Regions:
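Transmembrane helix-loop junction
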Residues: 22, 35, 66-70, 106, ...
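Secretory targeting signals
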Residues: 1-14, 44-112, 148-152, 158-161
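Helix-loop-helix units of permease transmembrane domains in multi-pass membrane transporters
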Residues: 17-53
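Hydrophobic alpha-helical transmembrane segments
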Residues: 1-24, 63, 179-188
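Terminal transmembrane helical anchor/hairpin motif
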Residues: 112-187
């Protein structure tokens, strides 16, 4: 799971800058800047495309897992567990990655500078969380409390804290996007 999340992070890091700065890379910005459409429409459509990629990348492990289980002869599927784990618990984390990556790239407005700043942020978060003495989930962006599945009651009482933390971090990511959007300049 950790390797797959690292792979997802790299995809979001590179695709987010390409979606934001593609009009400048392809020199389409002269036409794009003359369009009478708000910046919000352009950026929201790019964000929605990244969320669509996140949904596809969350669905792939479920489909492959079901296929592998079928090939091994297992037919007792628990799709509610798959749905909760992937779409309710994992997908919001991917959306948080997208929000932070978008905010950084909107503020930096440079392809490689945005990559560098994003990587520094994520490496610092990982190092502080892994080697530091702090285990405070409200301090580290994207982190949520641990949870366990059980056969008797599923995720049980662990679901509510997960939902609240995901709401908290997505709200902070939206705030970062709004702040970055205030500094975003179109036409330059």
């Amino acid at each position: 799971s950790y390797d797959y999340n690292l792979f997802i992070f790299i995809i979001f890091l590179f695709f987010s800058v390409d979606t934001i700065l593609l009009v400048y890379i392809t020199r389409y910005n002269i036409i794009n800047d003359a369009m009478p459409v708000s910046n919000v429409v352009f950026l929201f459509s790019k964000f929605c495309s990244m969320v669509g990629i996140a949904i596809i990348l969350v669905t792939i492990p479920m489909v492959l897992g079901v296929i592998i289980q079928l090939l091994k002869g297992h037919t007792d599927f628990n799709f509610s567990v798959y749905f909760i784990e992937l779409y309710v618990l994992t997908l919001p984390g991917f959306i948080q990655m997208i929000l932070l990556s978008f905010a950084v790239h909107l503020l930096v407005n440079n392809k490689f500078g945005g990559h560098g700043v994003s990587m520094i942020i994520w490496v610092c978060l990982f190092l502080l969380r892994s080697f530091g003495e702090m285990d405070y989930n409200l301090f580290f962006y994207f982190y949520t409390p641990n949870y366990r599945w059980s056969d008797m009651n599923g995720i049980g009482h662990f679901l509510e804290p997960q939902l609240w933390f995901n709401f908290y971090w997505i709200s902070l990511g939206c705030l970062l996007i709004v702040i970055a959007f205030l500094f975003y300049q179109r036409g330059i």
